[in-house]
Amino acid sequence: MLLVIDVGNTNTVMGVFDDQRVVCDWRIRTERETTEDEFFVLASQLFAGKDIKPEIITATIVSCVVPPMRKILHAFCKKYLGHEPIWVSAEMDMGMPILYDNPAEVGADRIVNAVAAYERYHDALIVIDFGTATTFDCISKDGEYLGGAISPGVGIASEALFARASKLPRVEIFNPPAQAIGKDTAKSMQSGIILGYAGLVDGLVRRIVKEMENKPRVIATGGLAPLMANVAETIEEVESGLTLEGLRIIFDRVSNS
């Protein structure tokens, strides 16, 4: 079986594939100060909950945007799984040209999402990933990674507001307001955070569309994708398992090359 790991700044998502079928997946907090032994203890508990024995995992592929986690996961794989992990990078031959001025700058998670999305749709695309940062990644109709945009995530933006505006309360950001005009402070903040962020998404997507040769399909992934798809006018599809599927696709391509 194949273990796929996507390490983000806030959360780490893991999944186990049996051929092309995802058997199970988990979302855990990214702990930069952990050790390979502590990671194994946590992973073992997750595996046991799904009756997965570590010895049946024969390969691991990782996308990671948190440099300290590379050493930890490399040691975990070697010590407890008996193999070295494959690390996703722009230098790999994944069947997708990276048309960035410096391809090495492209985050592994952005590449993974782009590969998975194009494999699924085979069309011009904008992939929006709502994570710690919100990334907009553009793929041409011919399957080229064109570049994109990066903005602060919804969580970062709201936390900055809570921290810097001492008289404003901390509000729930996972429930969109019924209207833009808030009738109290909490609803006004929800409007500004959620509907305001939807405006950011729609405005940026419309600008990007004007620069692309073919009209793209707009898809969203990440933890807040379902919420934002309900309030942003330009999002057409939500693909919650995009990153894990992309890791599986890249592993297959690299293994068969």
Swiss-Prot record:
The keyword Protein transport does not apply. Pathway: Cofactor biosynthesis; coenzyme A biosynthesis; CoA from (R)-pantothenate: step 1/5. It catalyses: (R)-pantothenate + ATP = (R)-4'-phosphopantothenate + ADP + H(+). Its EC number is 2.7.1.33. It is an enzyme of class 2 (transferase). Keywords: ATP-binding, Coenzyme A biosynthesis, Cytoplasm, Kinase, Metal-binding, Nucleotide-binding, Potassium, Transferase. Substrate binds at residues 100, 107-110, 185. GO terms for cellular component: cytoplasm. GO terms for molecular function: ATP binding; metal ion binding; pantothenate kinase activity. It is found in: Cytoplasm. The keyword Phosphoprotein does not apply. Gene3D superfamilies: 3.30.420.40. Its main location: cytoplasm. It comes from the Bacteria. K(+) binds at residue 129. ATP binds at residues 6-13, 132. GO terms for biological process: coenzyme A biosynthetic process. Homodimer. Catalyzes the phosphorylation of pantothenate (Pan), the first step in CoA biosynthesis. PANTHER family: TYPE III PANTOTHENATE KINASE. This is Type III pantothenate kinase. The gene is coaX.
